[in-house]
């Protein structure tokens, strides 16, 4: 009853519950049904009385009263007249709030086209009428007539006529023989008279007959629009408006400013123009004005309505008085400031404050310090309530006074109020979910918020003036969620990689590292201590130091809780750390009996978390932080200039390198090497020199020295301690301080040949300083640009993945991905164990030798299992993946695996898509902010050999080798791999060997670890002959296809192939080297082809005509690209390029089938390469390759499906089409990971897999079967499955399709939810498409639900959604039973059944 009374006062309609939102085109009747009256005058308000004009844009009669419950003339005031319509002024007595809801309309004197359907490409109106957009515009803007009904005349339907042609036609045929119209009326007639069913039928039959691709595409576009209209029930003529709706006046307010001026919304100006022109047109029609005047007025009306809906879309932009373009209705929705992103997705919050942060080292991990002033303000309502309850005040007014005067009892009550009431702290930019965490407030004096030092990493906060915002969760549910889910103690692990994020940093690490150092010859060395008490005593009395080597008894408890003790060789410092370990025997002392670098501390915290749980970890972290700080303070580590050690050998290394560079210069002058090769070698030489100086410096700094007098070990170099412990600084920075700065990069990314030999301690010369400014400035410029880029990448990722939620426990799929260790240049960069930890095994994993079971199929692979798997030497494991999950919406828990931030299997309702997007996007921003730390120092040492990473026996796959004239083995195969097998015959490593490499081992050889297997020249790619004979040149014409450069000083000539197609004379040449046999004929290769080797541009000839060559000799060399520095600059755009699935500029060409290469007849500037298939019944495939691109295959080479015919970056679409989803996934994951790995950022593969899954949601129809699809349609995978199920049920032929890879932007725009797509990008286009198709948004994702103001269907909101879903399905069941008339008796067992099968809400 109370609620009803309240509603009576508030005039509120209770909120409606709805499950979906539909959008369609408004018919004129619909617009009139919304409207409360027609607006006839352009007037707004009377400037003297400030009252709205009647029938004007703010009319109170149409839109409602200005003041609550008061009519305009003031005859009726107060609640008691509610609902009465005043007879004098015609205003209904009600709330003024209705002025935000009630709409009006304008009856147009002539129809006008809706600009969205006309100009939003592709134009819907012109596609539907099958005319060009230009022609439609000519008709609409009164330039041409159009023939709508030719009758018996020679005119054609839809023919355009100019004014003169129309007059002539009227004269010729008479006015009633044909109909030609002009303006929107004409288009309206044409659209209204369309028979959509007939058109659709005609288009389908035409599609079946046509063969031309272009025509098919055009017909498909039209058919799609026609079908959209048919399915949605929209009529085509509704795209032409006869009535314009007017939005409520309070949404386009008019505010009086002081001084008698008004501030108004632009919409009022735009509406005013429409009304003025419309009224003028009405008057002209009444006056029977000449046609030309009326037509002009109609055109102007059309333009003003265009401007109202989308200003600037057509013609010139309409500007206001101050030359500013007016904001139209479309602009209200678009972009960052539009309705979607500004108001619906980005709302402001009350109960919040912000202030500067300072460090609070005495806080517990779950606490933060809140300034008293701030707390008083934030918790006011709670304080008022408590004051009232305790009887300090009887009214809110009294309570207010007490609080304002800051009476002592207020502070006591504030203490009570904030106890156990968590607050949220947020630091902008919030790049991942750890940017907002909950803490329990403790009151502090002053005005700064105190933050616990350990959570700084998560917030990326420091105390140089950062500010943070505080928010108060008000409702009980909000407080509960803050405490249970967001408390800082619950966020110990990083969601991106599962490593601890609450890890000591900087001073704390330094303190712990200092504690754990072991020095030789310290006082008391070799003493033994029975317990920690004794040890403390000895430390106090200075019998031992923290670093003395001692033997100590460490007491702990075993698994059963029985105390035991063990003696360790250790130091007092390490025992102090061990003292803090949780006393439950699960974490052994060994973990802190080592040097405590940041990595080791992180490992220690991780072990404690996995074995002892969250509570112990939090207590341990707090204690370890206190210990670290206190010992960093006591150690007093600082550094002076002498700590930067310059190695004595530096001068010699530099001198040697300078001589080497001179030698290269000489070789270049002698014509032995090219400019490019010289550049590469010089850069390489300096790169190696820098490394060498750095190594010497590190060796010097690391060296252990002893004091001559006391024999004690001297204290360590403090710079080395800082860097080595991971507290601050990196070896790279140390190298610049004490070694040599090394090579610098130009802004273009090329490396400057002259390095910076000085370091910062010696000081730079002017030239060196100038060279280094490039890098420094580039760093700063990059940072500014990349922050925006990275933010945009994150936004696209979130948008594409926002509806990916864990919805089921297990999908039961049989498919998955194969995981192997990632090896790069012989180094294992990501071990198999690291990649499979926390994933679900697809098959049973057994030990390859003993056959004993390690992990069952469908079980999660945990830390102990990983150790077993690595021990067993298993090379590859199949795991479940989000990519292959078969759930229709979202993913299942088993495919996803472990929730990285909790270390447990992932919960139902976890928003894994958003977490994945944040995990990938967050380091993007981080990296961009970190580019300039190295000051642009270039790092380049090219790899030129293969080493064995394991011991074992060599096996060569696809072996194809020759011995050359020097007697060494040379690799002649294009895809040879060298594998190493261990004694059990299990493959331990497998590496590809480049063509032309020298092999040091052969099949069956035994190798030791680190032994050289093969080496090659990293700067050139050789072309070698496999037959012996005499060289002859073909088409190598001086000046046309080859340039001969002679060096005057040495007389040595070298020949380089130049681009022969740049001159008309050279266009038919095919420069090649031919090998003739003894009888003068062209020698034959082993595969049967001729020994003719085609040369590519820039190849340098190594032989002369007539030279005798033997097998494996080099004929020519092609130089490779010069080294550019890699830093994330190449990185961020690279990641974006991969996620956007763009085709790289010079992309690789991939073989689609296995077979033999044949070179066909060449075109003018393309080379034809044909693959003759190896198996029967397969058509040969032909590729066109631009001439002059380095092409390394010869006629008759055997090639496998998926091999590269032309090198380069492959296009991801090709990988998907040729090798399938799994290959695509592994390519994308590896490429993206490589970029992040370069920066030392660890991201779990599963995050990238989730995004790739979202990119693969669409299928291109290859065979329509009996469905209504058209071949080439892009449909949702889920939709296709549903349609096919129906078709199979009816015994019809299902449609089939190929998966398509969409870039993240495209995928976001093609999401089934139009609300989500519209709020992302291209708002008008998305809404236009959705309206025509009459789309329904099922509100599945997070974004849509935020926009309509509901709980998101993830987390706690997901449970509610689930409960609602189960409830409705039960209701339906009962209703169904009732209908059948079996009564409710049968319904109960079914419900029982449903309750058991319902997914558990976790």
Curated annotation (Swiss-Prot):
Binds 1 Mg(2+) ion per subunit. Its cofactor is Mg(2+); Zn(2+). Pfam families: RNA_pol_Rpb1_1, RNA_pol_Rpb1_2, RNA_pol_Rpb1_3, RNA_pol_Rpb1_4, RNA_pol_Rpb1_5. Keywords: DNA-directed RNA polymerase, Magnesium, Metal-binding, Nucleotidyltransferase, Transcription, Transferase, Zinc. It catalyses: RNA(n) + a ribonucleoside 5'-triphosphate = RNA(n+1) + diphosphate. Zn(2+) 2 binds at residues 811, 885, 892, 895. It comes from the Bacteria. InterPro entries: DNA-dir_RpoC_beta_prime (IPR045867), DNA-dir_RpoC_beta_prime_bact (IPR012754), RNA_pol_asu (IPR000722), RNA_pol_N (IPR006592), RNA_pol_Rpb1_1 (IPR007080), RNA_pol_Rpb1_3 (IPR007066), RNA_pol_Rpb1_3_sf (IPR042102), RNA_pol_Rpb1_4 (IPR007083). One of its GO terms (biological process) is DNA-templated transcription. Mg(2+) binds at residues 462, 464, 466. Zn(2+) 1 binds at residues 71, 73, 86, 89. One of its GO terms (cellular component) is DNA-directed RNA polymerase complex. CDD domains: RNAP_beta'_C (cd02655), RNAP_beta'_N (cd01609). Its EC number is 2.7.7.6. GO terms for molecular function: DNA binding; DNA-directed RNA polymerase activity; magnesium ion binding; zinc ion binding. The RNAP catalytic core consists of 2 alpha, 1 beta, 1 beta' and 1 omega subunit. When a sigma factor is associated with the core the holoenzyme is formed, which can initiate transcription. Belongs to the RNA polymerase beta' chain family. DNA-dependent RNA polymerase catalyzes the transcription of DNA into RNA using the four ribonucleoside triphosphates as substrates. This is DNA-directed RNA polymerase subunit beta'. It comes from Rhizobium etli (strain ATCC 51251 / DSM 11541 / JCM 21823 / NBRC 15573 / CFN 42). The lineage of its organism: Bacteria, Pseudomonadati, Pseudomonadota, Alphaproteobacteria, Hyphomicrobiales.
């Amino acid at each position: 009853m109370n609620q009803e009374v309240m509603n009576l006062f508030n005039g509120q309609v209770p909120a409606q519950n709805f499950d979906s939102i539909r959008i369609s085109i408004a018919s004129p009747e619909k617009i009139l049904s919304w409207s409360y009256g027609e607006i006839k005058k352009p007037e707004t308000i009377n400037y003297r009385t400030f009252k709205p004009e009647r029938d004007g844009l703010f009319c109170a009669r149409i839109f409602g009263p200005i003041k609550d419950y008061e009519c305009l003339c003031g005859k009726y005031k107060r609640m008691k007249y509610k609902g009465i319509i005043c007879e004098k002024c015609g205003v209904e007595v009600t709330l003024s709030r209705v002025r935000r809801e009630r709409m009006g309309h304008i009856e147009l004197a002539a129809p006008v086209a809706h600009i969205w359907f006309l100009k939003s490409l592709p134009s819907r109106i012109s596609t539907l009428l099958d005319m060009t957009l230009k022609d439609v515009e000519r008709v609409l803007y009164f330039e041409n007539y159009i023939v709508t009904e030719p009758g018996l005349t020679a005119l054609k339907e839809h023919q355009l006529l100019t004014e003169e042609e129309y007059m002539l036609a009227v004269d010729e045929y008479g006015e009633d023989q044909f109909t030609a119209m002009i303006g929107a009326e004409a288009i309206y007639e044409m659209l209204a008279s369309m028979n959509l069913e007939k058109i659709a039928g005609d288009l389908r039959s035409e599609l079946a007959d046509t063969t031309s691709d272009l025509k098919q595409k055009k017909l498909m576009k039209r058919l799609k629009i026609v079908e959209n209209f048919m399915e949605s029930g929209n009529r085509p003529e509704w795209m032409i408006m006869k009535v314009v709706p007017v939005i409520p006046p309070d949404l386009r307010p008019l505010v009086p400013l002081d001084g008698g001026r008004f501030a108004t919304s632009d919409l009022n100006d735009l509406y005013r123009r429409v009304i003025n022109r419309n009224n003028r047109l009405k008057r002209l029609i009444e006056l029977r004005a000449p046609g030309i005047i009326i037509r002009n007025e109609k055109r102007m009306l059309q333009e003003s309505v265009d401007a109202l809906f989308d200003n600037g879309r057509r013609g010139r932009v309409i500007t206001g008085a101050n030359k500013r373009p007016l904001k139209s209705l479309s602009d209200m929705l678009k972009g960052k400031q539009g309705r979607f992103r500004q108001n619906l997705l980005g709302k402001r919050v009350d109960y919040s404050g912000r202030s500067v942060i300072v460090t609070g080292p005495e806080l517990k991990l779950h606490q933060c310090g809140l300034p008293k002033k701030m707390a008083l303000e934030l918790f006011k309502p709670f304080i008022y309530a408590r004051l009232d309850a305790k009887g300090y005040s009887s009214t809110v007014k009294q309570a207010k006074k007490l609080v304002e005067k800051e009476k002592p009892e207020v502070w006591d009550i504030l203490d009570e109020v904030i106890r156990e009431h968590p607050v949220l702290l947020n630091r902008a930019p919030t790049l991942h979910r750890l940017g907002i965490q909950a803490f329990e407030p403790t009151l502090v004096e002053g005005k700064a918020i105190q933050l616990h030092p350990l959570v700084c990493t998560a917030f990326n906060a420091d105390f140089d003036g950062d500010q943070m915002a505080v928010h108060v969760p008000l409702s009980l549910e909000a407080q509960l969620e803050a405490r249970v889910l967001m408390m800082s103690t619950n966020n110990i692990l990083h969601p991106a990689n599962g490593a601890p994020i609450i890890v000591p940093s900087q001073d704390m690490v330094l303190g712990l590292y200092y504690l754990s150092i072991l020095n030789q010859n310290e006082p008391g060395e070799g003493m033994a201590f029975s317990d920690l008490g004794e040890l403390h005593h000895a430390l106090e009395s200075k019998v031992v130091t923290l670093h003395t080597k001692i033997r100590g008894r460490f007491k702990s408890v075993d698994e059963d809780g029985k105390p035991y003790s063990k003696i360790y060789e250790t130091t007092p410092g390490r025992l102090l750390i061990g003292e803090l370990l949780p006393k439950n025997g699960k974490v052994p002392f060994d973990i802190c009996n080592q040097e405590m670098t940041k990595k080791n501390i992180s490992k220690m915290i991780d072990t404690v978390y996995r074995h002892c749980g969250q509570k112990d970890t939090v207590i341990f972290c707090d204690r370890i932080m206190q210990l670290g700080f206190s010992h960093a303070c006591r150690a007093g580590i600082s550094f002076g200039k002498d700590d930067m050690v310059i190695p004595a050998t530096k001068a010699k290394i530099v001198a040697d390198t300078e001589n080497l560079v001179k030698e290269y210069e000489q070789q270049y002058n002698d014509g032995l090497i090219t400019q490019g090769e010289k550049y590469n070698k010089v850069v390489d030489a300096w790169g190696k020199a820098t490394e060498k100086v750095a190594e010497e410096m590190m060796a010097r700094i690391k060296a252990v020295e002893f004091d001559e007098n006391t024999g004690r070990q001297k204290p360590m170099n403090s710079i080395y301690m800082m860097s080595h412990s991971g507290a601050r600084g990196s070896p790279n920075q140390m190298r610049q301080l004490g070694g040599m700065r090394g090579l610098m990069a130009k802004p273009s990314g090329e490396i400057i040949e002259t390095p910076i030999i000085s370091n910062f301690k010696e000081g730079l010369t002017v030239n060196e300083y100038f060279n280094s400014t490039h890098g420094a400035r580039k760093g700063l410029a990059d940072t500014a640009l990349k922050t925006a880029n990275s933010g945009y990448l994150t936004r696209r990722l979130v948008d594409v993945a926002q509806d990916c939620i864990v919805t089921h426990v297990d999908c039961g799929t049989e498919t998955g991905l194969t995981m192997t260790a990632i090896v790069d240049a012989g180094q294992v960069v990501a071990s198999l164990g690291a990649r499979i930890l926390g994933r679900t095994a697809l098959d049973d994993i057994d030990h390859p030798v003993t056959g004993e079971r390690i992990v069952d199929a469908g079980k999660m692979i945990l830390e102990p299992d990983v150790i077993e798997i690595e021990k067993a030497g298993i090379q590859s494991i199949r795991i479940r993946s989000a990519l292959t999950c078969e759930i229709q919406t979202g993913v299942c828990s088993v495919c996803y695996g472990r929730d990285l931030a909790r270390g447990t299997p992932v919960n139902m309702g976890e928003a894994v898509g958003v977490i994945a997007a944040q995990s990938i996007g967050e380091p993007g921003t981080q990296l961009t902010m970190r580019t300039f730390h190295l000051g642009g120092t270039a790092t380049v040492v090219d790899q030129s050999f293969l080493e064995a990473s394991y011991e074992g026996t060599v096996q060569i796959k696809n072996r194809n080798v020759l011995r050359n004239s020097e007697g060494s083995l040379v690799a002649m195969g294009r895809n040879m791999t060298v594998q190493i097998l261990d004694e059990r015959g299990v493959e331990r490593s497998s590496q590809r060997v480049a063509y032309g490499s020298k092999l040091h081992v052969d099949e069956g050889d035994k190798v030791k670890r680190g032994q050289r297997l093969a080496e090659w020249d990293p700067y050139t790619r050789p072309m070698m002959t496999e037959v012996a004979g005499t060289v002859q040149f073909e088409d190598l014409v001086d000046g046309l296809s080859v340039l001969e450069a002679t060096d005057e000083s040495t007389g040595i000539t070298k020949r380089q192939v130049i681009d022969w197609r740049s001159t008309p004379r050279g266009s038919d040449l095919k420069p090649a080297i031919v090998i003739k046999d003894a009888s003068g004929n062209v020698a034959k290769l082993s595969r049967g082809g001729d020994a003719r080797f085609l040369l590519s541009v820039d190849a340098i000839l190594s032989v002369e005509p007539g030279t005798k060559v033997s097998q494996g000799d080099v004929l020519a060399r092609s130089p490779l690209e010069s080294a550019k520095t890699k830093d994330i600059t190449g990185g961020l755009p690279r990641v974006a390029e991969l996620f956007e699935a763009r085709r790289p500029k010079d992309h690789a060409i991939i073989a689609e089938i296995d077979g033999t290469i044949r070179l066909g007849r060449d075109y003018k500037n393309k080379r034809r390469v044909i693959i003759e298939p190896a198996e029967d019944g397969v058509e040969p495939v032909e590729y066109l390759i631009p001439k002059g691109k380095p092409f390394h295959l010869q006629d008759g080479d055997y090639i496998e499906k998926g091999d590269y015919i032309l090198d380069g970056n492959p296009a991801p679409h090709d990988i998907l089409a040729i090798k399938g989803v799994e290959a695509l996934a592994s390519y994308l994951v590896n490429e993206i990971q490589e970029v992040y790995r370069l920066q030392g950022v660890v991201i779990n593969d599963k995050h990238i897999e989730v995004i790739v899954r979202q990119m693969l949601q669409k299928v291109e129809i290859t065979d329509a079967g009996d469905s209504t699809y058209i071949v080439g349609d892009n449909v949702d995978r889920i939709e296709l499955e549903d349609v096919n199920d129906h078709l199979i049920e009816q015994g019809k032929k299902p449609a089939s399709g190929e998966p398509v890879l969409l870039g993240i932007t495209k995928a976001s725009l093609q999401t089934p939810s139009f609300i989500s797509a519209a709020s992302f990008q291209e708002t008008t286009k998305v809404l236009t498409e959705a309206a025509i198709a009459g789309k329904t948004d099922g509100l599945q994702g997070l974004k849509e639900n935020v926009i309509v103001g509901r709980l998101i269907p993830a987390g706690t909101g997901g449970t509610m959604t689930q409960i609602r879903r189960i409830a409705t399905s039960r209701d339906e069941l009962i209703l169904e039973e009732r209908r059948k008339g079996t009564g409710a008796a049968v319904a109960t067992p079914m419900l029982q059944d449903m309750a058991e099968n319902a997914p558990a809400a976790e």
